[in-house]
Structures are given as C-alpha cells and as structure tokens.
C-alpha cells in the first residue's frame, strides 16, 4: 500500500505545480503580446494608408515607396508612413501579400493624420461601401487632414464619404462610367491620370499611382526633390508629360 501511496502523492504534487505554472503563463503571454507602435519622428508629415482585405498591391506600394523615400532627402519636411485598418490581424491583399496594420482605427489612439491615402481594394465598388465604420473613419480623418488622396477605385470611398461634392475627380479608366452612374452629382473626368482639386488628389491607379505620388511630392518639395525621388526608383519624371488636371 505504501508503495502505491508515495508515487500517487508525487503525481498529485507535480500536477498541482503544472497547473500553477499554466495559470501564470497566460499573464506572461498577455504581457509579451502588448501592442507596440511605430516611433513617429516629429516635424514630419504623418501619412496614413487605409488598408483592408483585397487592397491592390500597386495602389498601396507605389505611393508608399515614394513617400517613404522622403526621409532620405535633406532640408525637407519628410514623411512618416504607416498603415491603418479595422483589425489587429494581418490583412491579405488582392495579390496575396499579408500585411500587419500599424494601427487599428477602431481601437487605437491614432496620431494626427496630415496626408491620407486610400488605395483601391477589391470590393470598393460594392460591399466596402457598406462598411459604415470605415466610411465614418474616412470622414473623420478628412476633417483634419491637409491632403486626401485616392488611387484607382479608392475614389469610390471618397465619394461615398461625400468628400468629392463640388470637386473634380477621376478613377480607374474602365470604372469611370460606373462611378458616374453611382454618383451622378459628381464631376468625374476621363483622359487624365490624376486630378488635383483643393486638398484632394485622385488618380487612375495602377502603375500611374507613382505619378500621382510624385506630383504631390513636387507640389510640396519642388521639382528637384521629385526628380530625385523618381530617380531612386528608376522612374523618368516630368509632370508636363503626364495627362493631368489641376483645378485652380
């Protein structure tokens, strides 16, 4: 009987210790998973990119590349670039890239956003426009942002948020008629790659997202800086050769 008792007692003791350790582990895990945020440099423009499942790579990465490279130019007000989404989990782009958002706009305290970028996403012509929280967020950011830009069908989001009323805009060429039918009160132009009207810059998207981003940099920093940024990405840049419209 004693031979059975002591092994049984040992098993019970080890089991209790194991349970005690397991109870402590979730606390350690919770601490280790505490969210950390980017360090944003002062005296820079804060540039937020709105991302979600189905975001198209080029409309995100083209302006992101151009704007991020401003930190390597001297004597200018460079840009802090970061992403915002409605989740803490990775989003999956249309092409399959997985990206962890820097901020969750539903939960986190966001920095002031100076420049807001809305790349196109797969469902910007339908279900995304029914996302009330997202549309409300866009409206809220617009109140303080100095510039708001869209690429490709990102213009549909701006239109749904009622930001393009009284403004001239453009979108992905084959979706212009769709946008005109959906928002008949808007002035939507074709045969241009981007439109600058007030604080809003809307572009045709795709690879031409580079041109719209370079235009904003030229507008903010001048021709030489824009050419330098373009050269760093092996892009021939001359705004005069790009079909565009600036509304004065």
Language-model-derived ranges and their functions:
Residues 44-46, 168, 199:
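Residues that mark the start of a beta-strand
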Residues 17-148, 156-159, 177, 190, ...:
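Extended, subdomain-level signal for the structured scaffold at the beginning of enzyme domains
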Residues 165-191:
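A conserved active-site-flanking secondary-structure segment within enzyme catalytic domains
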Residues 148-149, 169:
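A short beta-strand/loop micro-motif in the catalytic core of glycosyltransferases
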Residues 2-8:
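Sec-dependent signal peptide recognition
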Residues 12-15:
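C-terminal motif of bacterial Sec signal peptides marking the signal peptidase cleavage site
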Residues 189-204, 234-238:
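Conserved Rossmann-fold dehydrogenase catalytic segment
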């Amino acid at each position: 009987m004693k031979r059975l008792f002591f092994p049984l007692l040992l098993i019970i003791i080890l089991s209790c210790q194991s349970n005690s350790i397991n109870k402590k582990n979730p606390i350690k895990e919770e601490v280790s998973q505490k969210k950390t945020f980017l360090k944003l440099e002062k005296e820079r423009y804060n540039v937020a990119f709105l991302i979600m499942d189905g975001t198209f790579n080029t409309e995100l990465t083209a302006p992101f590349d151009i704007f991020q490279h401003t930190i390597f130019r001297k004597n200018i007000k460079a840009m802090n670039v970061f992403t915002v989404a409605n989740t803490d989990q990775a989003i999956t782009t249309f092409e399959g890239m997985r990206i962890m958002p820097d901020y969750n706009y539903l939960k986190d305290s966001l920095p002031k956003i100076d420049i807001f970028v809305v790349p196109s996403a797969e469902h910007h012509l339908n279900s995304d426009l029914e996302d009330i929280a997202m549309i409300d967020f866009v409206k809220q950011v617009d109140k303080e942002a100095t510039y708001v830009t869209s690429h490709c069908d990102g213009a549909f989001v701006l239109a749904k948020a009622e930001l393009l009323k009284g403004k001239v805009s453009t979108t992905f060429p084959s979706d212009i008629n769709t946008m005109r039918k959906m928002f008949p009160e808007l002035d939507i132009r074709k045969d241009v790659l981007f439109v600058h009207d007030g604080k809003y810059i809307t572009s045709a998207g795709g690879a031409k997202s580079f041109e719209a981003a370079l235009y904003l940099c030229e507008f903010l920093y001048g021709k030489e800086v824009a050419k330098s940024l373009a050269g760093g990405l092996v892009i021939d840049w001359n705004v005069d050769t790009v079909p565009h419209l600036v509304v004065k």
